[in-house]
Amino acid sequence: MYWNILGEFDLMNSFFIGNVEIEKTAALAPMASVADKSYRLMCKEYGASYLVSEMISSKGLCFGDKKTARLCEIEKEERPYALQLFGEDPYYMGKAAYKLNEYSPDIIDINMGCPVPKIVGNGSGSALMRLPDTAAEICREVVKNADCPVTVKFRAGWDENSINAVEFAKLMEQAGASAVTCHGRTRTQFYSGKADWDIIRQVKEAVKIPVIGNGDVVDGESAKAMYEQTGCDLVMIGRGSYGRPWVFRDVKHYLETGEKLPEVSIEEKMAVMKKHCELICKYKGERQGMKEARKNCAWYVKGLKGSARLRAQCGGLNTISDLYEMIDHILANELGE
């Protein structure tokens, strides 16, 4: 329990999705081109209780695309872990789910919430919220072919005039989903404005399966607030983890004690950035790894002295030595050495 004896906040320490037990702290959201293996491992090290992969193309998997297959690779340290599929065709989604079994994910998640035009234009992601019958058939096919529990991630609705998260959640439950994740924004909002947590509350009250809440959780206080206001079984953090994987440690500490941890020191921040970039290079090679590390470095240096200049400098990082040199300069500047 968190807080307990008349200390108001009262929360069980874990819950189950099917037969998979998950600690009730905070999960890392699936984020394409962001939450790769290195990113997930950093968040796991800092306490993320549940991880979801970058979205995996069902057709890419079925047609043997090697890049797609690499997205399915799991490190044992990542568990409990979900592989997330996207696609618009029930047949290929079912076939892809069957192929995912060989990677032994703890959970298979279905993406019905991505707002990106390229995905929506193909009838995938949040476009499926306007095609509930197809969405239900996709869920049934994935459940039928998966060897593990299946979950579905979706949004509040397509736009403010078509909020259908409650009905959609019920449909997914009927189609065999073991849990759902609701992002409190509509597709047309993308990531602007505020997430409507009341919609997450309504979803939680409407179904018997676990509900994960997503949108605007950025620290311990907002995590506690989402738990209290929605009754959700788990909170999920996406953009709030950019350049701050320690947010999961902060959330867990706050839920357990009601106290905020001190701000991360510049020394720890730089050590984490260094380790993160080294992991990226380990899995993707130095040349490609440093290209992909640039955006992460830009997030890590946000708020530091001369951050605009530092972010520009991040865009020119080509080697791990470049990174080490930049870190030395940052520490000297911040610590006055």
Specify the residue positions occupied by each region the protein language model found.
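Hydrophobic faces of well-ordered beta-strands that scaffold small-molecule active sites
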Residues: 26-30, 51-53, 81-85, 108, ...
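Alpha/beta enzyme core
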Residues: 95-108, 112-124, 133-209
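Alpha/beta catalytic cores of nucleotide-metabolism and tRNA/nucleoside-modifying enzymes
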Residues: 6-15, 22, 26, 32, ...
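Glycine-rich, positively charged N-terminal anion/phosphate-binding segment
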Residues: 11-16, 31-106
